[in-house]
Amino acid sequence: MLENYSLLLSVGYCITKPEVVCKLEHGQVLWILEEESPSQSHLDCCIDDDLMEKRQENQDQHLQKVDFVNNKTLTMDRNGVLGKTFSLDTNPILSRKIRGNCDSSGMNLNNISELIISNRSSFVRNPAECNVRGKFLLCMKRENPYARGKPLEYDGNGKAVSQNEDLFRHQYIQTLKQCFEYNQCGKAFHEEAACSTHKRVCSWETL
């Protein structure tokens, strides 16, 4: 019993010391004979000063890991990417509501899942080039959040496109046309194998 009580204290569980534990510590008799009736003074629990000190130490350990901005707000910063604000209450358990903001894109978000979704949507797919083996590569470029309302221009043939989706579709088509073009007949292929097969067919036709 004494061992269980000391384990609870070491974990930080604050309870008052039961009378049985007090008697065990002082070496008194644990069982009371029936003819003896305990008085009201014996029912009072023993309060240990050491218990209050341990409780204060446990609270101090948890509070050292965070910075206090004022008496009602608590902010944690992890690598400067995401700032979390917690509201403090009289209850020792922190509130689970988190307001996150993403410094990299400058957007305030309600929760972490929106942060993940916004990071994915802030990258745009831009067809860039075909590599040596004929695989189509997509390079990720950061979208400018301030240029969303402006018409976008594609330098490949000088057409101005107002919507991002139209621009991506246009760039995709232009890149496929430029990817593997066989100059003799003017046909374009998006895979090197198809282009080389067509070259062989064309060369046999000319013989």
Swiss-Prot record:
| Phylogenetic placement of the source organism | Eukaryota, Metazoa, Chordata, Craniata, Vertebrata
InterPro entries from the UniProt entry: KRAB (IPR001909), KRAB_dom_sf (IPR036051), Krueppel_C2H2_ZnFinger (IPR050826), Znf_C2H2_sf (IPR036236), Znf_C2H2_type (IPR013087)
Arranged from A to Z, the UniProt key words for this protein are: DNA-binding, Metal-binding, Nucleus, Repeat, Transcription, Transcription regulation, Zinc, Zinc-finger
Q: Which gene encodes it?
A: ZNF487
Q: Which GO terms describe its biological process?
A: regulation of transcription by RNA polymerase II
Q: Which Gene3D superfamilies match?
A: 6.10.140.140, Classic Zinc Finger
Q: Which GO terms describe its molecular function?
A: DNA-binding transcription factor activity, RNA polymerase II-specific; RNA polymerase II transcription regulatory region sequence-specific DNA binding; zinc ion binding
Tell where it localizes.
Nucleus
The record ties this protein, via SUPFAM superfamilies, to: beta-beta-alpha zinc fingers, KRAB domain (Kruppel-associated box)
Please identify the protein, giving its name as recorded. Zinc finger protein 487
PROSITE patterns the record matches: KRAB, ZINC_FINGER_C2H2_1, ZINC_FINGER_C2H2_2
Q: Which residues belong to any copy of the KRAB domain? A: 1-43
So what family is this one in?
Answer: Belongs to the krueppel C2H2-type zinc-finger protein family.
Name the job this protein performs: May be involved in transcriptional regulation.
The yes or no answer to whether the keyword Transcription is present is yes
This protein's record includes keyword Protein biosynthesis: no
**Gene Ontology cellular component terms for the protein in this record:** chromatin; nucleus
Which parts of this protein are zinc fingers (C2H2-type)? 177-202
